[in-house]
């Protein structure tokens, strides 16, 4: 094997087995990763990118998966032939991995510092005091604030970004030659995501280790990787240095991944999807400034559908067991109006108060003070019966549709259940007919009616969540991080669907997200929140083009732009 190649994968094929059927997941892929290089594997869910990384780590699920052919050379070892005992010395020591969800990788009952100490105890001969000093140094290296406090904290006591930094500290503790980062920023705010990418770059430059970075977002990896491999249905369809892949993509799938993220410079009527590119049917119609101005003249000549007036939400928290309650304002004096047929974007980092405000509008969590008017009536003072009637009019699409769907109900019954509660349709037969029509409108086949939530992909489940929401014929829909857990390509499909449904049914959206690029694409008005207050409020394009506040500038700067 050539010296400069740290990792060389040759004609690797992997199959999974179930109920006597072999399913080929990885189909003869080959690539090399050099020393001191960052290579990204990009593709949507199910493309095989994570399975490839698990094979390199020797972590393929036993009994149901098998490497059917090929080799994985790491330095002078073919990892396909290495036994489990030898792999224990390589894994964590020479090859380390950061996972997508740090909460499921960290032990919830063990302090963060102790978890990193465990790695060092397993792979080094340092004394206990030396190990503690090393962990504090690692926490400083990954730029954790107050390293000693984090050392003593449990995972649930720190933020998502801090948990991911603890995971990175664990991964680099033994100074590995290769770091595999599997979607390490997917669940994080754009600003935290940028910080984590900058941190990985800094560590790589300092330690000269190689990084295999796995993501579904091509724009994101362009800011980090030297080389890109594009995976589609278990095959590498394109590979090369990052700038050539970006500036001159050859495969339609690569072109689709680049185009699926909303552009900062213009607004397409429809976001291009992978199926559009694969069938060469990309709609490049742009919504002009004039179209937008004319739409807004009509929109804002109406009476507002919703008025939020000086709303506050205060929580009481204790700083210690015997201490007094300390008030914390999650929403602090917020006022704005929403007009029929409008999409207002609510954007800000985690903890800024945007979801709390959404819940207050939905009356799921009552505001401490202030007025919320829907069609001119204050909904904060409604009785139980009136509130129930309001629920039909104001609905929500959740971030995680799987958590909001009953796993024991078929999709059809899950959608029909709230229809029955709110007297939509006169009979079961009428309701079923309507549900089948709605499933068709959200791009699902009629057979979905009889299937269960676990049988669907993330994007399909989000479509089911949308179907359940629109079945009640609401007027105002709160979309709370409705696309943040989806692949960029699937996200484009769902955003197109939301816009199509809006033009068909005249819905009004409050679109909550931490991703300013997505919100800017969807929104007429943009409301930027920070620490419970409104930072900026105005036309989405105007705020994006010339933000006034530093906080807004920071959010815009953090959006992956691509090359």
Name each model-derived stretch:
Residues 130-149, 429-447, 556-557:
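Conserved ABC ATPase "signature" region
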Residues 92, 156, 174, 454, ...:
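Conserved signature/switch motifs of ABC ATPase nucleotide-binding domains
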Residues 66-78, 370-378, 390:
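Conserved ABC transporter NBD signature motif
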Residues 239-240, 248, 534-538, 546:
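ABC ATPase "signature
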Residues 153-158, 162, 452-456, 460:
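Conserved ABC ATPase signature
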Residues 173-177, 471-475, 491:
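A short, proline-enriched helix->beta-strand linker immediately N-terminal to the Walker B motif
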């Amino acid at each position: 094997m050539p010296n400069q190649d740290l990792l060389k994968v040759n004609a690797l094929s992997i199959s999974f087995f179930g109920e006597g059927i072999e399913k080929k997941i990885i189909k003869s892929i080959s690539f090399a990763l050099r020393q001191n290089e960052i290579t990204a594997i990009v593709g949507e869910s199910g493309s095989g990118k994570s399975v490839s990384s698990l094979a390199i780590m020797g972590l393929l699920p036993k009994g149901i998966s098998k490497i059917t052919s090929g080799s994985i050379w790491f330095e002078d070892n073919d990892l396909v032939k290495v036994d489990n005992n030898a792999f224990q010395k390589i894994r964590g020591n020479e090859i380390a991995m950061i996972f997508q969800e740090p909460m499921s990788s960290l032990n919830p009952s063990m302090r963060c510092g102790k978890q990193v100490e465990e790695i060092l105890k397993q792979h080094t001969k340092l004394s206990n005091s030396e190990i503690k000093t090393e962990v504090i140094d690692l926490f400083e290296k990954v730029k954790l604030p107050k390293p000693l406090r984090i050392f003593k904290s449990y995972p649930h006591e720190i933020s998502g970004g801090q948990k991911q930094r603890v995971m990175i500290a664990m991964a680099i503790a033994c100074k590995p030659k290769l770091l595999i980062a599997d979607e390490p920023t997917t669940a994080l705010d754009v600003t935290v995501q940028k910080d984590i990418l900058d941190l990985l770059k800094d560590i790589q430059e300092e330690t000269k280790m190689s990084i295999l970075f796995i993501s579904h977002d091509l724009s994101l990896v362009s800011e980090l990787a030297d080389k890109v491999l594009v995976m589609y249905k278990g095959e590498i369809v394109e590979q090369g240095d990052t700038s050539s892949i970006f500036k001159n993509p050859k495969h339609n799938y690569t072109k689709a991944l680049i185009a699926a993220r909303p552009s900062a410079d213009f607004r397409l009527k429809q976001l291009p999807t992978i199926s559009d590119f694969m069938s060469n049917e990309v709609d490049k119609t742009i919504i002009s400034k004039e179209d937008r101005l004319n739409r807004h003249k009509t929109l804002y000549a109406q009476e507002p559908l919703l008025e939020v007036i000086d709303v506050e939400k205060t929580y009481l928290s204790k700083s210690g067991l015997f201490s007094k309650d300390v008030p914390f304002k999650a929403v602090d004096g917020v006022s704005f109006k929403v007009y029929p047929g409008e999409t207002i974007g609510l954007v800000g980092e985690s903890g800024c108060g945007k979801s709390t405000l959404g819940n207050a509008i939905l009356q799921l969590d009552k505001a401490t003070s202030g007025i919320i008017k829907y069609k001119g009536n204050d909904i904060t003072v409604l009785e139980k019966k009136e509130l129930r009637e309001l629920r039909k009019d104001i609905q929500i699409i959740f971030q995680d549709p799987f958590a909001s769907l009953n796993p024991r109900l078929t999709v059809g019954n899950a959608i029909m259940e709230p229809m029955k509660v709110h007297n939509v349709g006169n009979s079961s037969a009428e309701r079923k007919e309507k549900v089948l029509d709605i499933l068709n409108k959200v791009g699902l086949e009629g057979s979905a009616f009889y299937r269960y939530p676990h049988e669907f992909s993330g994007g399909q489940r989000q479509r089911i969540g949308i179907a359940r929401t629109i079945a009640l014929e609401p007027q105002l829909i709160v979309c709370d991080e409705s696309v943040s857990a989806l692949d960029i390509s699937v996200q484009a499909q769902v955003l197109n669907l939301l816009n199509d449904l809006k033009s068909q049914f005249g819905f009004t959206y409050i679109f909550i997200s931490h991703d300013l690029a997505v919100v800017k694409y969807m929104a007429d008005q943009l409301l930027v929140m920070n620490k419970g207050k409104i930072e900026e409020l105005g036309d989405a394009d105007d705020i994006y083009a010339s933000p006034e506040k530093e906080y807004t500038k920071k959010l815009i700067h953090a959006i992956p732009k691509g090359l």
